[in-house]
Amino acid sequence: MDTDVFRRHANCRCLVEYDNGSGVYKNAHSKRFYKDRQEEIKKIDIERRKELDNKQNNNKRILDNSRKSGIIKDELKTDKQRQHMIASPGYKEGKSYIYGDEKTAEDLYNEFSGKGDLIEYKGEWLKKERITAERTIGVYIDQNGVATETNRFMIIYSKSGYHIYPRR
C-alpha cells in the first residue's frame, strides 16, 4: 500500500485507498493498514517481553550462583547502609540517602534484587545492580550538594552483605 493515503478527518483510522496507475480515487475505506500495524506492535511487544524475561532469568541465575559460591551474601551490611540513612547516627553528610530505616532497605532488596541491570565491565560482573522503582525511594545528592528526589537506586553486593543507595 502506498504511503500517500488520504484520511477522511484528523482522528479517522480508516484509510481511503486509490489506484496509483490511473490516479482515479476510489472511495473504499479500509482498516487493513491499522490492523496490520496493531499486529506488528503486538509482535514487537511479545519480543520485548521475552527479552526482558530472558534478561531477568539471567540476572537471577547470576545472583543465585554468586550466593551459592559465597561471592555475595544475602544480608544487609548495616554499617554501610547507615551511611545512606539520614536518621541514623552513622549518616555521612553529603551522601545520598534512602527514606526509611534498615527494614526499608531490606524490603527494597527483597522486592527488586535481580530485576534491574547488572553492571558489567569487560564481561565481568562488578557486583552492582542498577534499579528503577515506580515510587520515590530517597534523595540523590550530586557532587555540588544539590539534592533531588529519585526512584532509582543501586544495590552493591559483597561477601559480607549488600547495601543500597539512591542514584540519579
Which residues does each PLM region occupy?
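Functional cores of ribonucleases/endoribonucleases
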Residues: M1, K60-R168
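Activation/maturation switch segments at domain boundaries
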Residues: M1-S69, V139-R168
